[in-house]
Amino acid sequence: EMSFPGFDAAVNAVQAGQADAIMAGMTKTKERENVFTMSDTYYDTKVVIATTKSHKISQYDQLKGKTVGVKNGTAAQRFLESIKDKYGFSIKTFDTGDLMNNSLSAGSIDAMMDDKPVIEYAINQGQDLHIEMDGEAVGSFAFGVKKGSKYEHLVTEFNQALAKMKQDGSLDKIIKKWTASSSSAVPTTTTLAGLKAIPVKAKYIIASDSSFAPFVFQNSSNQFTGIDMDLIKAIAKDQGFEIEITTPGFDAAISAVQAGQADGIIA
């Protein structure tokens, strides 16, 4: 079963015990591994500055005196915090990508930073966005559950199915469906392909973001879809368990797993 509260809310949902796991384009970091048991990675990402087409920015120096939007709790926020004093800009945080995009369109922020494939997807969908810079490599996405929870076995099950998908090409197929790239840069670090776990319970609550296309977003039929949704559904099918997806937002998803309100996070 799935819910889509947004990245911030998805994190909080896992921390609060309202979701079992989180999957929403969550970058694997040492800090997060202190709180979450995280899977092998499935996608390398970059974060990049985006503006409207009429206000292009090609270097960080041009951000002086401006306001840059970013989503709460993300790798992009951490990067901006590390350079804001050097380049003299301020940061405004948002719970969802939709709110951030709307603020950029309305002119209440001058630029925003998000994952490069997310911005590229939005541009291809006709949104008034533009990128001039190459972006900053900040890590790779992974699935996570609360460290020490009784559902840590979900990470083992995820890794087993992910290894199989890396070997048979089905992971690349999912990623290429939604982007122009592939997962080929992500190392296959597990040798568990072909194994199958015995689920501890019939259905797990997985927390995710709510608007993070092409990883998770609502389509024209009001159904949540994207890379993360295709991936977690394929893994659940391979491992023989059911999932309920919640989408509280990235930060809330992390909090939900940490609080035991969710079993895992893919965000």
Show which residues each predicted segment covers.
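Bilobed "Venus flytrap"/periplasmic-binding protein-like clamshell domains
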Residues: E1, M26-T27, D44-G97, N101, ...
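Extended ligand-binding regions for polar small-molecule ligands
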Residues: E1, S54-I57, T67, N72-A75, ...
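Extracytoplasmic small-molecule ligand-binding "clamshell" domains
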Residues: E1-G25, T93, V200-A267
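Stable alpha-helical elements in mature extracytoplasmic
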Residues: G6-A10, Q18, I22, Q59, ...
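Hydrophobic residues within well-ordered alpha-helices
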Residues: V14-Q15, L63, S103-S105, F143, ...
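A ligand-binding cleft/hinge motif common to bilobed small-molecule-binding domains
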Residues: M23-V35, R78-K84, S103-V138, D251-S255, ...
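Ligand-binding clefts/hinges and TM-proximal coupling segments of bilobed small-molecule sensing domains
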Residues: A75-K92, G126-M133, Q160-V200
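Periplasmic-binding protein-like
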Residues: Y42-T51, K116, E120, N124-Q160, ...
